[in-house]
Amino acid sequence: MTGKEPSANKEPSASEHPGSEPERTLLGHPAGLAVLFLTEMWERFSYYGMRALLILYLTKHFLLADGTSSLIFGSYVSLVYAMPVLGGLTADRYLGLHRAVMFGAILLCCGHLGMAFEGPPATITGGEIHRSALHTQTLYLSLAFIIIGVGFLKPNISTIVGRLYPADDPRRDSGFTIFYMGINLGAFVATLACAWLGENWGWRWGFGLAGVGMLAGLGIFHRGRGLLKGAGAPPDLKSLQTRVAGGLTREHWIYALGLVAVLVAWQFLQHAGELGVALGIFGAISVGYVIFFSIRECNSAERSSILVMLGLMAFSVLFWSLFEQAGTSLTLFTDRNVIMGDTLTAGMFQSFNAGFIMLLAPLFSVLWVWLNRRGWEPSTPAKFALATVQVGLGFAVLVYGANQSGDGRVAAIWLITMYLLHTTGELCLSPVGLSMVTRLSVARIASMMMGVWFLSSAFAGYAGGLIASAMAVPTGDAPLAPAESLSVYVSVFGDLALIAIIAGCALLVLSPWLRRFMRHAETPTDAGQSPVR
């Protein structure tokens, strides 16, 4: 932003540089880490709090069909994972990390607070659904603000964490572990608090709490910017503040284009088919270029690494498209077919993933180190295979639990077990994903490969919406009885379980062969990393 910032008007001097010994510390780490921890915790609080309610809000308040709601959700998640590529590039080349985070946080506040204006609920009269056009468009516009806000904030705040430490600082990994704990803490609390408020007191209260959380994050980052010691300053402040057209500086034009991007996202959310076509074209061009480059410019070892990486990205798309059912089909299944008791609500069950991560991530970290020291640690392809099998087993557990039901209502323990299996799968795959890209990429197209990796997450989000739409349960004046809706879910859950388990087992069989092609790039364990979503 244009306001005054520490060291924003010049490059940090040697004494100010983030890589030097920080003047103030907290628990042995730079004091700026606390600012970033709290900012990201509240940002994730707002994101996951809204996410826990969104599919229920679409189907219950706006009375949108399951299929339509799932496609909107999938489009939203897809764009959320695609936009950080552009947000990161803009920050690196022009804005600087600090300004990008501030701009993203402001957009997020606008989006989350916009979600709190729920308007009158939709009604059914004579078989026709009537809903407020104004509040429907407010919904889409609010989601668009959140999408672009995440794009500017999410990739850049993580980068600032890295710049608080010298490259060889032994505290660096520990600092990132603390930072990622903030992500999971925010997600855990949000899916409990926002979901409970939204489903019991009214949607506006749940979404409003998410917005208040983002406001807290914005305030903390703004007030604590002095503790960042110049980390995240623009690469060229003079160029950024040069007037280029219409009397506006380059910085102001970037903000204006960010608002234009909000309008583009607003339209894509209402036209999921066009978004799918755009993703398909862009993905085909990107992957085609990478393959062409590997054939023309790479030696045999480099080409093999690139092709293995592209293959593992395909399995990543499969895993995350099934994992993302948590926000759509699994939440609707929970609402309609799970025995929840008097305390828990459907959205609150999403908290089990974040809770299990906080409990199990340290154990997995120790496990990988223990296995690595004995030469038993699974290779990257094997970890991807184990993750895929586990996400399939999670759905298989639900099918088994459903078959024990006599009235269409499933005991909550089966759903909790599914979340446990999905989380252990996530712990096998997520920490090694980015590491794989950095290790296997040819230096000449390393940035391109990182972009393709993020694009694969966008594909997974969109595919997840398509999968959830296949489980659309007819709704209207007379919704299906639990036993009837259960049969719809069980049929698709069974197919998903079979596909994932077969695919995972096939990859596990192939993993020794794949490892030979990537052996020159393999490095020691990734145990120090944590899942980042």
List PLM regions with ranges.
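Cytoplasmic membrane-interface "Motif A"-like loop-to-helix N-cap segments
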Residues: 93-109, 302, 370-389
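Short amphipathic helix-loop junctions that connect adjacent transmembrane helices
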Residues: 52-72, 326-349
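Central cavity-lining transmembrane alpha-helices of secondary-active solute carriers
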Residues: 74-92, 109, 154, 188, ...
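Glycine-rich segments within core transmembrane alpha-helices of 12-TM secondary carriers
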Residues: 79-80, 171-191, 198-199, 206-217, ...
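C-terminal ends and interior cores of transmembrane alpha-helices
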Residues: 104-134, 385-407
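Transmembrane alpha-helices of Major Facilitator/SLC transporters
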Residues: 80-82, 223, 281-293, 343-374, ...
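Cytosolic juxtamembrane N-terminal segment immediately preceding the first transmembrane helix
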Residues: 2-44, 123-137
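Intracellular loop-helix junctions on the cytosolic face of multi-pass helical membrane proteins
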Residues: 1-28, 167, 195-331, 335-341, ...
